[in-house]
Amino acid sequence: MALGETKGIILFTKDFKEKDKLVKIFTESYGKLMFFVKGAHRKNNPLLPAILPFTEAVYIGNFREEGLSFLNSSKEVQPFRNIQQDIFINAYGTYILNLVDAAIEDQHYDPNLFQFTHMALSALNEQKDPEIITNIFEIQLLERFGVRPEWHHCVACGETQGKFDYSSKYSGVLCEKHWHLDEQRYHADPRAIHFIRLFSQVSYEKVQNIQVKEETKKSIRETIDMLYDEYVGLHLKSKKFIDQMKTWENTLKIPPRKKEEK
């Protein structure tokens, strides 16, 4: 790698010595890279706005295959302002970026995942439902962890309509007529499976049209947690924070209105 430029999204930053920072950026052209930013704590550093958490920009610098890369300048800086300023949205955004960091190796070229991440953060920044946005991201990201469940139809007969449950034995969904084939299936709420099947293929442009009751969201969360525990094995601090946040969320904000599912 050499001098060049690429779009990128800040994954995280951490202090390095007294005045400098290490900044991990998910770049569109080179994958994930760790950058050294000298003098990052100086208030007059022109790079400062471009290396804040939840920022997307075009980054110009020395991109290296080994060791640290170096940032020279930036342009077209676009902060995800609502994510930066809202603790609740910030929590979901942090979790999404942590998932990205865990899902692919550094320097792995994945422009599709870059675009998907951009769309997820944009939807969060537009204050669309953060739980639904995150659930969609989790389900569609499973493939990056080598997990490819069959969500579209019953793995036994090809049925696409009706009630379904997830079977680890068959790596996909079973329709109600074939639940007897796996006594160890998830026994998940059929409504949760319905939405997870939808999330496996829906685009973020249609998120605003998805309405889910709070009790169903809870079932979806439990089912996705089962999938990640079984297949991925991640235990991210940002996910734990979201789980804890749900217990005190209603004391800090107005409870959401009841919604009709569709």
From Swiss-Prot:
Q: Name one Pfam family in it.
A: RecO_C
Q: What protein family is recorded?
A: Belongs to the RecO family.
Key words, A-Z: DNA damage, DNA recombination, DNA repair
Give an example GO cellular component term for this record: bacterial nucleoid
Query: What protein name is recorded for this chain?
Result: DNA repair protein RecO
Entry keyword DNA repair: yes
Functional note: Involved in DNA repair and RecF pathway recombination.
A GO biological process of this protein is:
DNA recombination
Recorded hits in InterPro entries, A to Z, give: ARFGAP/RecO, DNA_rep/recomb_RecO_N, NA-bd_OB-fold, RecO, RecO_C
Per the UniProt record, the source organism is Enterococcus faecalis (strain ATCC 700802 / V583)
Asked whether the UniProt record includes Plastid among its keywords, one would answer no
